[in-house]
Amino acid sequence: MQISLSSAQPQAWSGTVLALGIAEGDPNGWIPAMEERFSISLGDWLEQRKFQGKNGESASLQLLNPNCESLVLIGLGPLEALDVNSFRQAGAAAARASKNQTGSIGLLLPWNAVDPAEAVTVAAQAVRLALYSDQRFRSKPEPSIHPERLELLGPLPNTLSSALEAVHPICAGVELARELVAAPPNSVTPSALAESAAQMAHEHGLDLKVLERSDCEARGMGSFLSVCQGSDMDPKFIHLTYRPSGPATKRVVLVGKGLTFDSGGYNLKVGAAQIDMMKFDMGGSAAVLGAMRSIAELRPQGVEVHMLVASCENMINGSAVHPGDIVTASNGTTIEINNTDAEGRLTLADALVYASELEPDAIVDLATLTGACVIALGDEIAGLWTGDDSLANSLEGAAKDAGEGLWRMPMHQAYRKGLKSLLADLKNTGPRPGGSITAALFLKEFVRSSIPWAHIDIAGTVWSDKGRGMDPAGATGYGVRTLVSWVCAQTQQAEN
């Protein structure tokens, strides 16, 4: 999609869909001007539909005018209550109203109600992401009909064009994550994830190292390798690195859970466990791969970014790990596997040990880890666990800037006793109450205490059955925008 600024006023703009933001309490807005332009009684028409400009309201009118085929009015709510997220919602509403039409969208919102650079950027992102459609696996793909151009209208300075330069890289990263999560497990395998990383490395000049099973064995990754014992698919440990063109004063590691399919193992998923949806158990890896796709194009300076994904399947055969087996992670910790369906933390354990060996300034992992987090926070908010207040604040700020829900949860150390094993150093699961907390405490065992580390559980946010806002139904690409925002903030810190 081509995105540009236009100084044209709505009275003179020509295109396919003209979308105007109407604030609550401002009943006239652009309505008189539109009535004059199109010779219609727009006010009466809106009154019949009881349109008041409330947040979430919208009204569309087919004009059959050669210079403007459709008029879309988007309710913004009270003008004084507008925030950056209001512009995301408005952009998504404009996109939804423009589906099945070609040509261009002209979008006019009260850009100066917030930082105009932020407003135009998030609105443009929302339009593009809301128009996303995945037709890859249909024998007869439905034509994806939508406008090819977006013009942001109003008296905006041309300097804001530079703010729009980040729209494509960020959206491309989100779209990659959506594609990876949505694809079936016979398409996205551990090898396919490694191939995706290889393609990215080739196209964007990143460094790539892929550890095969023998390499992981040599490094003592018994925790990770125990998970893939029952699969015919070879595991892949993927290490992708972005290095800035100038000196790097910060190094961060992004770790993503990469279970391309999770049967639960001998603790087989049944009933509400949604075994049919366990293709999305690699949502963490999709998020970090998508973030690296964006970072590679944005080229932030001053920060070196490492991405780690320990990818495999959790399947059942005669060689699969048993409940009760004891394995040894690469830091020497012994783990009693009392639940084979708590496998993600076993793969992350060795990934976090590896991440610590890189001696970074911070480690952030993303994982579809626990159903307990979904019960606690639902499907719009991810959980954040960290013992580092500074890291928590920076991630919460990045998530807010990105428009992604994130809520800090307690690292209640007293629950650590629930991981005690009679035979090994620890068990991989604790009691059912507080399950998302004990999962985070388990992961903490594999991170050097001197390194700031955060765990983000995206089990609820990775998928949307019905769609919401700028996320059509299906994979959301959650986490990409937050990670990119956070990494770019590291650049600013490095400059200071």
Swiss-Prot record:
InterPro entries: Leucine_aapep/pepB, Macro_dom-like, Peptidase_M17_C, Peptidase_M17_leu_NH2_pept, Peptidase_M17_N
Cofactor(s) needed by this chain: Mn(2+)
Alphabetized Pfam families for the sequence: Peptidase_M17, Peptidase_M17_N
Catalytic site positions: 269, 345
Positions contributing to Mn(2+) 2 binding: 257, 262, 281, 343
EC identifiers of the protein: 3.4.11.1, 3.4.11.10
Compartments where located: Cytoplasm
Keyword Hydrolase among UniProt keywords: yes
Reactions catalysed according to its record: Release of an N-terminal amino acid, Xaa-|-Yaa-, in which Xaa is preferably Leu, but may be other amino acids including Pro although not Arg or Lys, and Yaa may be Pro. Amino acid amides and methyl esters are also readily hydrolyzed, but rates on arylamides are exceedingly low; Release of an N-terminal amino acid, preferentially leucine, but not glutamic or aspartic acids
Family annotation (PROSITE patterns): CYTOSOL_AP
GO molecular function terms noted in the UniProt entry: manganese ion binding; metalloaminopeptidase activity
Binding locations of Mn(2+) 1: 262, 341, 343
Alphabetical keyword list: Aminopeptidase, Cytoplasm, Hydrolase, Manganese, Metal-binding, Protease
Keyword Nuclease: no
Transmembrane segment boundaries: none
GO BP terms: proteolysis
Enzyme class: hydrolase
Highest taxon listed in the record's lineage: Bacteria
A GO CC annotation given for this chain: cytoplasm
Cofactor-binding details, from the entry: Binds 2 manganese ions per subunit.
Sequence similarity: Belongs to the peptidase M17 family.
Function: Presumably involved in the processing and regular turnover of intracellular proteins. Catalyzes the removal of unsubstituted N-terminal amino acids from various peptides.
HAMAP family per record: Cytosol_peptidase_M17 (MF_00181)
Name used for this protein in its record: Probable cytosol aminopeptidase
Species of origin: Synechococcus sp. (strain CC9311)
